[in-house]
């Protein structure tokens, strides 16, 4: 599997210097993720997830992009309502669209979500906007994670570098 989920931590005294060591246990799991935005980055990220054995539900405003991935075996959806309904709860939804359209997408997406769902902004949004979005969604019980994504279209083969910001609960999922 190519993705791992944090399964727990333990600490003990370092034998050299006496400081505290934080040890993390990792466990490979199969997960389901919804991907909104099937441009070059979003489509390849979905492919990498699926190649790693994960379940990926996809949506894009461009029906041809959805059809192309559906032909590769993805669960393709044609509306946001269908997309959200197809995902198991609690949902993890990765939004991989240009920063200029994230707020507009959230205006439509958030009313369809439930408590404990997670929205991941993987695009190039300014981090202060993502901090504000997280503050807005927290009272609704929706987690928001900012994940700057680097790797470009070559990430399909080489992997991606992810710079993650958000609450521990959401990141731990």
Language-model regions, residue ranges each:
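Short glycine-/small-residue-rich Rossmann-like dinucleotide-binding loops
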Residues: 97-99, 124, 149
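General beta-strand structural signal in soluble alpha/beta enzymes
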Residues: 77-78, 121, 143-147
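Glycine/threonine-rich flexible loop motifs
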Residues: 92-108
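Rossmann-fold dinucleotide-binding core
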Residues: 105-107, 126-173
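Short hydrophobic alpha-helical segments enriched in small aliphatic residues
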Residues: 5-7
């Amino acid at each position: 599997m190519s993705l791992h989920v944090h399964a727990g931590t333990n600490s003990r005294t370092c034998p050299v210097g006496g400081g505290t060591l934080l040890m993390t246990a990792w466990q490979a799991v199969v997960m389901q993720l919804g991907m909104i935005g099937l441009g070059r980055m979003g489509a390849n990220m979905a492919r990498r997830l699926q190649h790693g054995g994960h379940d990926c539900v996809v949506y894009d405003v461009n029906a041809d992009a959805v059809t192309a991935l559906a032909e590769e075996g993805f669960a393709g959806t044609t509306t946001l309502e269908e997309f959200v309904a197809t995902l198991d709860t609690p949902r993890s939804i990765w939004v991989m669209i240009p920063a200029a359209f994230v707020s507009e997408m959230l205006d439509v997406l958030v009313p369809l979500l439930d408590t404990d769902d997670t929205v991941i902004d993987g695009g190039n949004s300014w981090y202060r906007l993502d901090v504000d979005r997280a503050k807005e969604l927290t009272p609704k019980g929706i987690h928001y994670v900012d994940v700057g994504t680097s790797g470009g279209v070559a990430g399909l083969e080489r992997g991606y570098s992810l710079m993650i910001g958000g609450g521990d609960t959401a990141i731990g999922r």
